[in-house]
Every structure is written in C-alpha cells, then in structure tokens.
Regions:
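Glycine/proline-rich, flexible active-site/cofactor-binding loop segments
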Residues: 40-53, 137-160, 289-294
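Contiguous, well-ordered alpha-helical segments that form the cores/surfaces of helical PPI scaffolds
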Residues: 26-32, 137, 398, 402
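Active-site-proximal, Lys/Arg-enriched surface segment
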Residues: 64-157
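Short alpha-helix boundary/capping elements
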Residues: 33-38, 49-52, 66, 104, ...
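Gly/serine-rich nucleotide phosphate-binding loop at the start of the catalytic core
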Residues: 1-63, 69
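Short linear interaction motifs
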Residues: 23-26, 75-77, 117-118, 380-381
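Structural motif
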Residues: 16-24, 123-128, 383-395
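Single, function-defining residue in the core of a domain
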Residues: 1-13, 91, 108, 148-477
Length: 477
C-alpha cells in the first residue's frame, strides 16, 4: 500500500525544478490524504509530526515559481492512466464533468462573486458569494464497484476580467465551454472518451466547441447529457425539387415531451442494473436535429422509470440507447467525489487572499466597476494571478490526494473490510469508503514508514520530522 503511494507521488518529480519544492509537494499531498482535521496546513504538521518551522515553507510552496500547474495536471493524467484500473465502455473511457460552488466570505479573495444555487437542499441559501469551479473526473473500477477519480478542478467564473492581463492563463470562455475544453484536454491523454454532463451543459456553444475540437483530430470524444422537459428538436428536412433559394436546414418541430404519449406504443421494455439495483424501464430512441442555427443531429432517448420521465441526449448516433441510459446513471459519481473532497480532505477549505485585491463590495451597483476592473498596476495584477494560481494548486493537490485514496480503496477490495478499520453503523458494501481508508492511513502511517525506510517519501518526511525528547512523566502508568 505504502509503496503504491510512493510510486504515484514519485512520478511527479520531473514537474519541479527544485528538490525542495518536490519535497513539500510530497508532504502536502500525503498530509491531505490522512489529516484528522481541516484547520489549514497546521493539520499536516500535526498528523505527520513535522517541525513547526515547516509552516511558512509550506505556505510559500503554493506561491513558488518552481512548478507549472499545467505540467502537474498532465502528469496526473498520465499517472492515472498508468496505475489506475480505469472503467471502459467499449473502446471509450468515461469522463464526468460538473460544476461546484463554494461559499467564501473573504473580501480580498480573487474570483469571488455572487452566485445563485439551484438546490432542493434547505441548508443551502439561494444566493452566496463564492467561487464557481468546474470539476472533471474519470470512472475507475468495475461495474460493481467504481469511483470517479478527480482529474482537475479549475476556477471557471469570476476571473474573466483578468483574461487580457499580462501572463494570464485565465480563459474568457463560458463555464460550459471551459468544461468541454477541460474534458478534451484530458481525452488527449486517455484517448477516445465519452463525456457525461447534466442538462445544464446541453447548449449550442458547448456543441459547437466540441465539433471544433474533434474536427481533424485523432482523439474522438462524444457527449451524453440530459435534455430539459421543454426541449424542442426538429426532423430532417424533406428532399425538395431543385428550385431557387436556400435549401431548408430543418424540418418539422418536435416537442420531445409529447412523444411520451404520441409514441407510447413504440416504447420498448427492458431490465438493467441502475444505481446498484435491477430495475424495469421503458425507452424510445429517435435521432433529431437540435440547436438554433446549429441543427446538429443528436440521439434522444426517452425513458420512463419509476413513474418519472427523462430525456437523454447524445452526440453519438452509434451508441446503443441502453448504454446511454446506463452511462448517465454513473454521472452522480462525481457528486460523491465532491462530497468526499469537502468532508474528508477539506479541498474547499482554502483561504488564499491578496492585499492587492480591492475589497469586495457586496452591495456594488451594476453601473460601478467590478473589483478586478479597478486593478491597473502590473505588480498588483501579478500578485493577484499568483493567488489564483495558489488556489488552483491547492485543488490540484486535493485531486491527487483523493484520487490516490480512491485507488487504494479499489485495490484493497476483498482484502480489507471497513469493520477491520473502524466501527460504522452502515459500512459500505464492496470497496472501503474514502473516509475509512484515510482513517486507516492515519492510524498506520508511522508503521508503514518504519517498514519501508528506503522509500523516497519515507526519507523526505523523516527529514522534516521533529525529534521530540521523551518526558519521564509521560512514561508513568
């Protein structure tokens, strides 16, 4: 187990131009995998028994110039492809994308803006000030036990005003377009892929960008998403006799929701495994044109399941309807990953801020300039971009930490049970949960280091550990 962690973390050494930066990368990533609380980098110092002097060095690491965020992400993609048991649908890997919003009260944190949360959870306020992230993961494991390994989590909104700044890497595209771009960047490493998204991402800009990316490229990526119940598509235009004028691009309009009644005799019945249970459902598949001024041919699958009606949409006309239904049932896995990132590793508990960032005004009028628009000094802009870089580096480390924990859970399936680690009233079936695996690592980390003194990560951690003196009073029984 510990040698696998060593292999994963050692594969990132080429991403750092200084040995010290690589050492702090190893310590911080391992610390995120086993820390017992979410009180900043001090939790890493406590759980790994490091010297108190490490505190400032660990903070400085996030602002160091000795690493490239792009290279670290690319190395993480390659590491996942090399070491992780990835799930495949035919010849396609399965990517999952979604957005996640995190509340932030800091007035000088770049990228914070007013956001609307559409959720049925009464604990979530409708409006918050915080960060809007785009998360991307890949399915790993088998059909009976799988996890969504986080590949990247990037800021997708709130930073558009920095797009024209010098040395800025911020994209000026919308959230849905950036999600497609992030997925295709990952697909270049994992080869042909299917991207699962929720209905928010079924839009003309997203489909246009996907067509631009896959045209003329060897890597192919398809998209499976959900359509709104009010979705309207179009039949193909009927062939017409040659005459003057532009030929029609679309045919008769079709309200997809009405097909549940008008075509109910054409629905097929099937049984399949959905969300871990064998279920009965009815479905109907039809290929139609969709998108104003785009009119791209999509495959729509109408599904009746437990009294609910859903409409799925896919860009592939060769994908089996039942495969689309099963694939979309895996989309919720990224929601589970977001939950574990929040509750276990504390990935969204960062608080990077900059004194060069103008104070955020919660009551700013629309006619007044935004906070980032007020920054004109080049030095201040550079410091703000460094803060954004630190935030995304923290998210990258959290993805690596959580992905490694998930892979350990999959590798130890059948060998390690939750009951052997800690008591749980309802232990997870199959693989050990991420929280239980982190508890196991936290409990046995020093035993692992003692059993593997020659490993690279063991030596890097021991160099920074504090050698405390033994107090006689503590030996009294």
């Amino acid at each position: 187990m510990f040698d696998f962690i060593d292999k994963v973390l050692s594969s990132f050494e080429s991403c750092f131009s200084r040995k010290a930066a690589f050492r702090w990368f190893v310590i911080l990533t391992l610390g995120l995998m086993l820390r017992s609380d979410k009180l900043g980098v001090t939790s890493v110092i406590r759980d790994l028994a490091l010297k108190p002097d490490c505190y400032l060095s660990m903070l400085h690491f996030f602002h160091a110039s000795s690493w490239s965020l792009h290279r670290i992400r690319q190395c993480w993609f390659q590491t996942v492809l090399r070491f992780f048991p990835l799930y495949q649908e035919g010849d396609f890997h399965v990517l999952i994308g979604d957005g996640v919003k995190q509340s932030k009260e800091g007035r000088r944190i770049p990228g914070v803006k007013k956001l609307c949360q559409e959720s049925e959870n009464s604990a979530k306020p409708q409006f918050i000030h915080g960060h809007m992230f785009g998360g991307l993961g890949i399915l790993s494991g088998s059909i009976h036990s799988m996890a969504c390994v986080p590949l990247s989590i990037r800021l997708h909104d709130g930073l558009q005003d920095t797009h024209d700044w010098e040395s800025s890497t911020v994209s000026g595209a919308s959230h849905v377009v950036q999600m497609v771009e992030d997925a295709y960047l990952a697909a270049k490493t994992f080869a042909n892929s299917i991207l699962l998204l929720d209905r928010y991402f079924l839009s003309v800009p997203a489909l246009k960008r996907l067509q631009e990316l896959i045209s003329g490229e060897a890597v192919h990526m398809e998209m499976v998403t959900k359509a709104k119940c009010s979705c309207t598509a179009f039949e193909k235009p009927a062939p017409r006799k040659s005459r003057r004028g532009r030929p029609p691009k679309k045919g008769k309009a079709v309200r997809l929701k009405n097909l549940f009644e008008s075509h109910k005799e054409q629905f097929r019945e099937a049984e399949m495994i959905l969300y871990g249970k064998k279920e009965k459902l009815r479905y109907y598949s039809i290929d139609l044109l969709w998108g104003q001024k785009l009119y791209q041919e999509l495959r729509f699958v109408l599904v009746e399941y437990h009294g609910t009606q859903s409409i799925l949409a896919g860009t592939s006309l060769e994908l089996d309807p039942l495969s689309m239904i099963r694939l979309y049932s895996y989309r919720f896995r990224i929601e589970c990953t977001f939950r574990e990132l929040k509750q276990q590793t504390g990935a969204f508990g960062y608080h990077f801020w900059s004194k060069y960032m103008p104070r955020l005004d919660y009551y700013r009028k629309k006619t007044e300039p935004a906070a980032l628009e007020q920054v004109k000094n080049d030095h201040a802009r550079m410091k703000i971009l460094q803060t954004v870089r630190a935030i995304e580096m923290h998210m990258a480390l959290s993805c690596i930490a959580m992905g490694t924990v998930q892979c350990l859970s999959l590798r130890t399936e059948g060998k390690l049970r939750t009951e052997q680690i800690r008591y749980q009233r309802t232990p997870s079936k199959g693989k050990v949960s991420e929280g239980a695996m982190m508890h196991y690592l936290r409990k046995h980390i020093f035993r692992f280091m003692g059993q593997n003194p020659a490993l690279r990560i063991t030596r890097l951690i021991q160099e920074m550990q504090e050698q405390s003196e033994i107090c006689e009073d503590l030996l009294a029984s």
